[in-house]
Amino acid sequence: MTTTTSTLPLPTPWRDKLNGILFVALMAAAVVQLADLPFIRQFGFSPLVVGIVCGMLYGNFLRGTMPADWGAGVHFTARRLLRIAVAFYGLNISIQQIAAVGLPGLAVSVGVVASTLLIGTVAGQRLLGLDRDTAMLTAAGSAICGAAAVLAFEPTLRAAPHKSAVAVATVVLFGTLSMFLYPVIYHAGWLPFDTQALGIYIGGTVHEVAQVVGAASNIDPATTEVATIVKMTRVALLVPVLLVLGFWLRASAAAGADGKSHAKLPVPWFAIGFLVLAIVNSLDILPSDLVTAIRKLDVFVLTMAMTALGIETRFAQIRKAGPRVMALGLVLYAWLVFGGYGIVKLAT
């Protein structure tokens, strides 16, 4: 009697999930190429922003062309892969960068992040009637690092994808406006800062890293260098902010469960991973070529996550809260421009 052994195919659920992940990866690869086109780069649109826009267009107009079973892979990319990518984003930060801007740069970063989060959360809920998640996601995008911060907050809050999408929209609109506005008001003589203070102001108040570089590069290289370092200092504050958010959510959950203390602590493990990898990067123990390769791969995975979020978002959901979210984005932008000016004046 002979026995034949054949290779069994993957179980259907896993095969469908893998197909969904690969589909998003192919879309993300196209997005990266699209974001690299000169006419898109000049506006400072990162692959993350282009990814969510392309994902939303596909999800709302062409979703029927994707097998429904692949949705599990899209969801996995928008949740699990997202968290891994946020953790590896820590390789973009180092203690040396934070030290380079000194106490004034750190003080401005802390002041801007804390005040913007507070204003956004309170104004969004009490003045504009937004739900907690949408208000906090929008505030995070303005306060810390644009789309990447929205991505980091979303799994911690367990927010719906469309809430992240509208928050990212404010980052795109007002961050892009900054790239044109800041050089204009500087050359008009309305920003009486030296190079160091000007770099701190731009890095401390513009939404995304690419937008910071876009705004500062229209002034001079020295300002661009300072602005980029200060911006990365704001990014580094993502970890303590997420940890505080986790403890606050636990306290809220405990209060809502008749004071029971066993409520699950939603401290995001990827925030710890972010911190560990930032320390690893500071120690300079990994080959520079390896770090560069991981950073590029991480941007690609983040682009996949944003694309997947876009696919899961529906325009009808955005229209429901769109005007109020944009109003909150405008309030926060006014605070960044004028309040940020005051904070820089005090710190420098």
From Swiss-Prot:
<feature type="transmembrane region" description="Helical">
    <location>
        <begin position="43"/>
        <end position="62"/>
    </location>
</feature>
<dbReference type="GO" id="GO:0005886">
    <property type="term" value="C:plasma membrane"/>
</dbReference>
<keyword id="KW-1133">Transmembrane helix</keyword>
<feature type="transmembrane region" description="Helical">
    <location>
        <begin position="135"/>
        <end position="157"/>
    </location>
</feature>
<feature type="transmembrane region" description="Helical">
    <location>
        <begin position="267"/>
        <end position="286"/>
    </location>
</feature>
<feature type="transmembrane region" description="Helical">
    <location>
        <begin position="98"/>
        <end position="120"/>
    </location>
</feature>
<keyword id="KW-0812">Transmembrane</keyword>
<dbReference type="Pfam" id="PF03601">
    <property type="entry name" value="Cons_hypoth698"/>
</dbReference>
<dbReference type="InterPro" id="IPR018383">
    <property type="entry name" value="UPF0324_pro"/>
</dbReference>
<feature type="transmembrane region" description="Helical">
    <location>
        <begin position="164"/>
        <end position="186"/>
    </location>
</feature>
<dbReference type="InterPro" id="IPR004630">
    <property type="entry name" value="UPF0324_YeiH-like"/>
</dbReference>
<feature type="transmembrane region" description="Helical">
    <location>
        <begin position="196"/>
        <end position="215"/>
    </location>
</feature>
<feature type="transmembrane region" description="Helical">
    <location>
        <begin position="322"/>
        <end position="344"/>
    </location>
</feature>
<feature type="transmembrane region" description="Helical">
    <location>
        <begin position="299"/>
        <end position="318"/>
    </location>
</feature>
<feature type="transmembrane region" description="Helical">
    <location>
        <begin position="235"/>
        <end position="257"/>
    </location>
</feature>
<protein>
    <recommendedName>
        <fullName>UPF0324 membrane protein BP2808</fullName>
    </recommendedName>
</protein>
<keyword id="KW-0472">Membrane</keyword>
<comment type="similarity">
    <text>Belongs to the UPF0324 family.</text>
</comment>
<feature type="transmembrane region" description="Helical">
    <location>
        <begin position="20"/>
        <end position="39"/>
    </location>
</feature>
<keyword id="KW-1003">Cell membrane</keyword>
